[in-house]
């Protein structure tokens, strides 16, 4: 996954890694991670810091080395892309920008891409995604729907 990064990204991440790696030993410890997170306005607990390190600590030595850091950053970038894509897709459906997709908006978009649906089919699609039962799809319901795909 880290091999999908450009040279420029790798060099930016090397710089970021150096900021975390306060003592320059090539390893990020929970203490170093905590220092940087706090400087960014976060306040993670010791166990949260350990969880963050464990998530990417491939060799289970309790610290993050640069290759592990790269893998983590590549993963985060991939997640960000898909989040942005989902947000953009939601905007396409939410034509009046009120934060909800109504049956009429869903029908309009589906028709414009050549999907002729009956009212029952549109209602069924809304029902499948509509978790709070208000008859429309909000952003969180849309995200859940997209993540199931």
UniProtKB/Swiss-Prot annotation:
Keyword Acetylation among UniProt keywords: yes
A GO molecular function held by the record: calcium ion binding
The record's account of how the chain is modified after translation: Trimethylation of Lys-116 observed in other calmodulins is absent here.
An example Gene Ontology biological process: spindle pole body organization
Binding positions (Ca(2+) 3): 94, 96, 98, 105
Residues covered by the EF-hand domain: 8-43, 44-79, 81-116, 117-149
Binding-site positions, Ca(2+) 4: 130, 132, 134, 136, 141
Keyword tags: Acetylation, Calcium, Metal-binding, Repeat
Chain residues that bind Ca(2+) 2: 57, 59, 61, 63, 68
Binding, Ca(2+) 1: 21, 23, 25, 27, 32
Superkingdom, natural source: Eukaryota
CC per GO annotation: cell tip; central plaque of spindle pole body; cytoplasm
Modified residues (N-acetylalanine): 2
Listed InterPro entries: CALM/Myosin/TropC-like, EF-hand-dom_pair, EF_Hand_1_Ca_BS, EF_hand_dom
Family: Belongs to the calmodulin family.
Additional record remark: This protein has four functional calcium-binding sites.
Chain's role: Calmodulin mediates the control of a large number of enzymes, ion channels and other proteins by Ca(2+). Among the enzymes to be stimulated by the calmodulin-Ca(2+) complex are a number of protein kinases and phosphatases.
PANTHER family: CALMODULIN LIKE 3, MYOSIN LIGHT CHAIN 1, 3
Protein name according to UniProt: Calmodulin
